[in-house]
């Protein structure tokens, strides 16, 4: 879900995602497009691509089980 994504970004970067990344690079925020300018921008492009492939699902509202290692 978008809420889970926000929490993950906040935990890993200690930044508020909406304020820090809504207009970052070419792909972060609404209507992203173009060649990513760096690794963070590439992550936004990959995120948008994944959402684009599952448009028939409630991907933005559904909760998902996930984990990561620091």
Swiss-Prot record:
PROSITE patterns: PA2_HIS (PS00118). CDD domains: PLA2c. Its cofactor is Ca(2+). One of its GO terms (cellular component) is extracellular region. Binds 1 Ca(2+) ion. It is found in: Secreted. It is an enzyme of class 3 (hydrolase). It catalyses: a 1,2-diacyl-sn-glycero-3-phosphocholine + H2O = a 1-acyl-sn-glycero-3-phosphocholine + a fatty acid + H(+). Transmembrane segments: none annotated. Expressed by the venom gland. The keyword Manganese does not apply. Its EC number is 3.1.1.4. Ca(2+) binds at residue 48. One of its GO terms (molecular function) is toxin activity. SMART domains: PA2c (SM00085). Keywords: Calcium, Disulfide bond, Hydrolase, Lipid degradation, Lipid metabolism, Metal-binding, Myotoxin, Secreted, Toxin. The active site is at 47. Belongs to the phospholipase A2 family. Group II subfamily. D49 sub-subfamily. Hemolytic and neurotoxic activities are not detected. Snake venom phospholipase A2 (PLA2) that exhibits strong myotoxicity. PLA2 catalyzes the calcium-dependent hydrolysis of the 2-acyl groups in 3-sn-phosphoglycerides. This is Basic phospholipase A2 2. It comes from Trimeresurus stejnegeri.
């Amino acid at each position: 879900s978008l809420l889970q994504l926000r929490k993950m970004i906040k935990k890993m970067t200690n930044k508020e995602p909406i304020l820090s990344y809504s207009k970052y690079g070419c792909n972060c925020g609404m209507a992203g497009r173009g060649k990513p300018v760096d690794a963070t921008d590439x992550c936004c492009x990959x995120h948008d691509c994944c959402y684009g492939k599952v448009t028939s699902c409630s991907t933005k509202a559904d909760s998902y089980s996930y984990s990561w290692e620091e």
